[in-house]
Amino acid sequence: MLSVEMISRQNRCHYVYKGGNMMRRILHIVLITALMFLNVMYTFEAVKAAEPQQPISIEKAIQQKEGQALVEGYAVGQAVSPQHYKLTSPFSNDYNVALADRKNKTSPEHILPVQIPSAFRSQFGLQTNPLLLGKKITVQGKLENYFNTTGLKNVQSMNVTDDTKTPPAEQQVTINEARGRLNEEVTIKGIITADQNAIGGGKLSTFLQDETGGINIYSPSPEQFPELKEGMDVTVTGKITSYQGLKEIVPNSSGIKINQSNQSLPAPKHLTINELINGSLGDQYEGRLVKLTAFVSSIPSSPAGGGYNVTMIDDDHHAMTLRVMNETGVINELDEGKWYEFTGVLSRYQTFQLLPRKSADLKLLEEQPAPPSAEGEYEGIVDRVVDGDTIHLKSPVLGTTKIRFVNVDAPETYHTPKNDADENQLRFGKKASDYLKTVLSPGDKITVKVGSEAKDSYGRLLGQVITESGSNVNLELVKNGYAPTYFIWPVDNEEDYQQFQAAVAAAKKDQKGIWNENDPLMEMPFEFRAREQGKGLTRYVGDSSNKTYVQPADWKKIAVENRIFFASASEAESAGYKKRQTAPQEHVPLRILSMNDLHGKIDQQYELDLDGNGTVDGTFGRMDYAAAYLKEKKAEKKNSLIVHAGDMIGGSSPVSSLLQDEPTVELMEDIGFDVGTVGNHEFDEGTDELLRILNGGDHPKGTSGYDGQNFPLVCANCKMKSTGEPFLPAYDIINVEGVPVAFIGVVTQSAAGMVMPEGIKNIEFTDEATAVNKAAEELKKKGVKAIAVLAHMSAEQNGNAITGESADLANKTDSEIDVIFAAHNHQVVNGEVNGKLIVQAFEYGKAIGVVDVEIDKTTKDIVKKSAEIVYVDQSKIEPDVSASAILKKYETIAEPIISEVVGEAAVDMEGGYSNDGDTPLGNLIADGMRAAMKTDFALMNGGGIREALKKGPITWGDLYNIQPFGNVLTKLEIKGKDLREIINAQISPVFGPDYSISGFTYTWDKETGKAVDMKMADGTEIQPDATYTLTVNNFMATATGAKYQPIGLLGKNPVTGPEDLEATVEYVKSFDEPIAYTKEGRIKLAEASDIEDPVTEDPITEEPGDDPGTEDPIKEDPRPGEDLPDIKETPGTAPVHQLPPSAISRFNEIPINNTKTADTANSISTLPLQTETAESGSDHQLPDTSAGYYNFMVIGAAVTLSGTYLYVRRKRSASRT
């Protein structure tokens, strides 16, 4: 038994031994096979990785919408806001580029906006690289929402692709197809249907038609193209655009080819006005020849924009414009009130228009149908009440749902109040509207009674509204005092006229509503509109009781119950009305002479080139010459007054300012000024000093025994803060031959931010128009109707158009005001706004204003006015002896100080505002401030630099004229980040920077109006949280205006220094050589590559308001869109993925990493793919590579095989036991 067992065990061991050898062999085979497989896989993956990824098209990317993608397309422009692209240079930034599959495929739906990271902007931003436009670009990034559409963000690489192949020629398309390819370049062919010289208005503008459609050909430069005439067969290549709804093709520079001439025209399609304006045929036939039969209802008396907008209607009063261009001569063959068959091109300017091309396009119908008449009664259902005399219906009546109540004119509610009169109008307008809502509710059935004139110029139906109960709502508005009557000739129904006029007379007698004497409507609605809209009164006013009419301005002379309004005097006379004759009245002549903005320049004279031809026209100014002109002009008239509009003192020459401007006051008294107002500079030294100037009293720097000014200063909007009482009289009344003439004073509210807050702490400047209107009401109650305003408020003139604060004042103030003497912005102005004469006589005594008026002695009102600006030309008059003596006296006193030479200028140095970058003189002054106070930085406001510094010896007087305000330097402590806020505040969105600077430099972005890059003068960084010292003047440190306020708020621990002039004098003295400051580039517009991604959220586009009669404008978004920074940066450290300066290259250069790939020759740069820090917040990941895949498989295989080997070993061990 034992031997058998041993034999069995031996056999089993032999078996196990043999089995172990077999397992080892199998394991070796598996390992070898696995390693060979992995090696093959590695080679396969490496080859696969080496194959370049093929880019997808822009259309494919747009369809894909999301995910990683390599896209390729042409740079066609830049996204400026959702669905709006700028397609031509110059571009405003480098934040994004728009790609499309073709250079001319630029409809928004075919464009992919690509966000450009900061690392690529120097190479791919279109502001920096405008020549990149039209180049083919390949971009690797992530598809996601950008500018509210599919875009490409998180960009990893950008390359310019070789695009040397000639693109396929653009295939010709039909006009109908071309009309649907907005912003794309197309080629079309057709027949010219009108001579461009007949309908083009001086431009290349005519129409092309084929069998499928028509389109306008337009270019503002006709001289670049052949003249197009009717019947030409032409081929046009250009871009499809749209203007005011009209589809146009703008031809390329050589994009018009004339194939043949004298070809037959397409036959015009006979349509109706209703089919065009209320159906789809308008769009279908736009740009094509059509025929219409219509009635000419009105022909304007004068053209607008090179042609006449004639109104034509059909039998049902559907209206359309017949646009008759001057060059056609057609207007002279048209008769109002006739039926015609018109042939022309269907055009569009927001709404459809018909353009006749020649006289043959007009055919007067031989049998004239009766004129269209809408007169009658129509049923309707109320939808809503719009205002006190307008409602909307649920369904159209005569083509419109808008009903304007006829015979009445309710107070307006469309406006935002700016003064008491506006508030009053709005309050009564709401009362009328609220009343209307009590009698008319949505769903109410009404009857609309329409007269012979069916619609107004806005397309609203004119009618009387009758309720189901028979109540005439129009008449009830008048009876209850919610609205006055309003009849415009012709009057349809005499019975209606008498009924309404009797109702308004009764309401007025009973003082109902708007007629309440204790709370009246301040302005009739038509009077309010004339003022608020700035158009003035234009309709002549007839008196139905005696058949006379008066000028528009005299409307008050006719009682409301007798008023009928006419479009012109000739219309009134055609209706049988005669011009109202009044007995000849004796008129009182009055001359008013004016000055403004003298600024104490009593000794200064100027060489001027008045006509801008480059030749000096003479020497102008100096107060003894101005005195001679004023006295001479005063002597020419029996009645003369001399006035001024402020800023006569302050910022003065040394000869005046060294003695507290008492020399200027003495000269004004010698000349004989009668009244003036205050400007902001009258407050330069505060209210106490201004009162001393007016009332007298000695000043340490003034003359002994100073007795004050002998004429008043008036200011209606200068009020005491504590009580609201006047700081100065609101007005002054001067009797001229028994007629009172009043002068109201007013100063711009912005003066509060232009002077030392401490000096005016007890007063405030209230709303100008409100103050003037209140003063005018007081004057009218006193029987004063001849009223002028001395307004230290801006005005400027371009041709006949006057704008600015004074123009706004003219539109907002009482109609009894006849003349406004403007000031503040140193301009020459002479013209009218809203019936008010506005005059401004330049600056510094260079000119005077001469206003001549005539006053009706009976009405005491100004009935005639005119003005001229007379320059103080020294060559045409001798200086006034008395004024010369006064001037000489004070020049002698000031001479020793003024004439001291303190330095020498090697060049002319300009100063002022830094709108266009730093200025030489501004740099000099700012450096002097910084040196005087030994600070890190200095700032000087542009308005404080009053003159330029001329080449040659520099006197104390020269520097005084440059810095005349006597401000004191102030040192403040600020943080580095505060400096940025201070600088940003002074950058105007319109004009740019203000301050001159020292100790640092900065660049700024015109789009954002913000500083971009700020550095110390030596180029080192300004640390945001470090403390620095800053020098400003005490005006800047304490002013409360928006641009100055951050200085006072952020500056700490103020230290007072010397006067600014003293610092400049000492700095100039410190130079051993002639001073030659230049424009150094301390302030520059930012290069696009300097601008960081400025926003971190979706762009917000504000919706414009709905202004009646206007389209919503498409404007470029001032922000660059949602340009999210791809890499977050920590202040003071280099950005993780920022390319080094040496890597910044232009397109078609070697890539950044200098590593050749299949596309090396055309690659620009590839963003390095480094592992990001936790702070970066970026989701950029390394892409899968063959190496990564291979390593993963090797590790997996090794683990698997190791496990298998261990398992076998364990089994083997178990078997042995």
From Swiss-Prot:
A divalent metal cation 2 binds at D647, N680, H792, H824. It comes from the Bacteria. Residues 1087-1142 are annotated as: Disordered. Its EC number is 3.1.31.-. Substrate binds at F965, F1035, M1036, A1037, T1038, A1039, T1040, G1041, A1042. Its main location: secreted. Residues 1089-1110 have a biased composition (Acidic residues). Its cofactor is Ca(2+); Mn(2+). One of its GO terms (molecular function) is metal ion binding. It comes from Bacillus subtilis (strain 168). One of its GO terms (biological process) is nucleotide catabolic process. This is Endonuclease YhcR. A divalent metal cation 1 binds at D597, H599, D647. Residues 1186-1217 form a propeptide. A motif (LPXTG sorting signal) lies at residues 1182-1186. Residues 1-46 form the signal peptide. Residues 1112-1129 have a biased composition (Basic and acidic residues). The record marks H681, D684 as: Transition state stabilizer. Keywords: Calcium, Cell wall, Endonuclease, Hydrolase, Manganese, Metal-binding, Nuclease, Nucleotide-binding, Peptidoglycan-anchor, Secreted, Signal. Optimum pH is 9.0. SUPFAM superfamilies: 5'-nucleotidase (syn. UDP-sugar hydrolase), C-terminal domain, Metallo-dependent phosphatases, Nucleic acid-binding proteins, Staphylococcal nuclease. Sugar-nonspecific endonuclease that yields nucleotide 3'-monophosphate products. No 5'-nucleotidase activity was detected, using 5'-AMP as the substrate, in the presence of diverse divalent metals and with various pH values. The active site is at R404, E412, R460. It is an enzyme of class 3 (hydrolase). Requires a minimum of 0.1 mM of calcium for a significant activity. Maximal activity was observed with concentrations of calcium between 1 to 5 mM. Is 10-fold less active with the corresponding concentrations of manganese. Inhibited by NaCl at concentrations of 100 mM and higher.
